[in-house]
Amino acid sequence: MTNIRKTHPLLKIVNNAFIDLPAPSNISSWWNFGSLLGICLILQILTGLFLAMHYTADTTTAFSSVTHICRDVNYGWIIRYMHANGASMFFICLFMHVGRGLYYGSYTYMETWNIGVILLFATMATAFMGYVLPWGQMSFWGATVITNLLSAIPYIGTNLVEWIWGGFSVDKATLTRFFAFHFIFPFIIAALAMVHLLFLHETGSNNPTGISSDADKIPFHPYYTIKDILGALLLILVLMTLVLFSPDLLGDPDNYTPANPLNTPPHIKPEWYFLFAYAILRSIPNKLGGVLALVLSILILVLMPLLHTSKQRSMMFRPISQCLFWILVADLLTLTWIGGQPVEHPYIIIGQLASIMYFLLILVLMPMASTIENNLLKW
């Protein structure tokens, strides 16, 4: 008799996705981040659910309710910090996952890649709205500054911003709708992740060489289930170390001051995982230009399959491209650092140079390097 996991309508789906899935035999630890992102999402939904049980989305009580969670709710402090630092872990995994895709040419799976870019945007939107909820100083002013960027859109900008705010400034209406959206978005992300996986399983996974691995496949279970469990344990170890030893390491001290519309903090900045984009935004003196650069800094990922000029898929055997890739990583780290610095000399010029370098690397230098490498193959 055939095993129930192969015949039952629901178990069959699970079986084909996580048990009998043919996987390349040579995928490295860089392929662990997909499952880690799934774990992060589940963790965020669960901790978020318990936080929502005690949180009140009202300008007068939001800050107090978060304090109440940390002081009075049983293990509320650990739930709150797991949620806040879980977001940081989520973005670390996201950046690693995207970086892996860029390095090994995974973007040639167009549908999977484009759903992934949509997932990245959705996650960034969710994290931004979540940051507003504690209603501290940085929550309020971050929400004001970032939503205000939409006013740069010609003709409809101002109306659009006031429509999002639900009034003439960030207020009660803004907070309640942000809470509603912050609650629903993770479920949309989960649905999109399933579509992401569906498209991936149409083609099968890529591998470090970028060459078809059809001739050498192994079952997902037990090989990669064990490997994913190891990854998950390391993720939880890092997360819990952060939560239990320095929970506020990645946060902003300003967010421990209740929101005050009459007092602007000296340096308004978003969470660390948005700083690279924030630096690109600030490096352009024009408001609309800055907003466009901000959106393009992420949207440029959609162009990756079109910018792929190499005859090889992966960068594994392309030393010049490898060099440029790591320069791009260094550039993004520089932008992240600049995003957290005040707008003054020499940070302004460093930010502008790093922003130019970012677009130059992706749009010009990397495609050029690929073409040079193609010609080197003839020698």
From Swiss-Prot:
Transmembrane domains' residue ranges: 33-53, 77-98, 113-133, 178-198, 226-246, 288-308, 320-340, 347-367
Binding site for a ubiquinone: H201
Cofactor requirement: heme b
SUPFAM superfamilies, A to Z: a domain/subunit of cytochrome bc1 complex (Ubiquinol-cytochrome c reductase), Transmembrane di-heme cytochromes
Residues bound to heme b b566: H97, H196
GO cellular component entries: mitochondrial inner membrane; respiratory chain complex III
Residues binding heme b b562, per UniProt: H83, H182
Cellular compartments annotated: Mitochondrion inner membrane
UniProt keyword annotations, A-Z: Electron transport, Heme, Iron, Membrane, Metal-binding, Mitochondrion, Mitochondrion inner membrane, Respiratory chain, Transmembrane, Transmembrane helix, Transport, Ubiquinone
Single GO BP term: mitochondrial electron transport, ubiquinol to cytochrome c
Membrane topology designation: Multi-pass membrane protein
Entry GO MF terms: metal ion binding; ubiquinol-cytochrome-c reductase activity
Cofactor binding, per record: Binds 2 heme b groups non-covalently.
Keyword Secreted: no
Pfam families: Cytochrom_B_C, Cytochrome_B
Main location per the UniProt record: mitochondrion
Protein role: Component of the ubiquinol-cytochrome c reductase complex (complex III or cytochrome b-c1 complex) that is part of the mitochondrial respiratory chain. The b-c1 complex mediates electron transfer from ubiquinol to cytochrome c. Contributes to the generation of a proton gradient across the mitochondrial membrane that is then used for ATP synthesis.
Subunit text: The cytochrome bc1 complex contains 11 subunits: 3 respiratory subunits (MT-CYB, CYC1 and UQCRFS1), 2 core proteins (UQCRC1 and UQCRC2) and 6 low-molecular weight proteins (UQCRH/QCR6, UQCRB/QCR7, UQCRQ/QCR8, UQCR10/QCR9, UQCR11/QCR10 and a cleavage product of UQCRFS1). This cytochrome bc1 complex then forms a dimer.
Record-linked PANTHER family: CYTOCHROME B (PTHR19271:SF16)
Protein family: Belongs to the cytochrome b family.
Protein name: Cytochrome b
UniProt organism field: Cephalophorus callipygus (Peters's duiker)
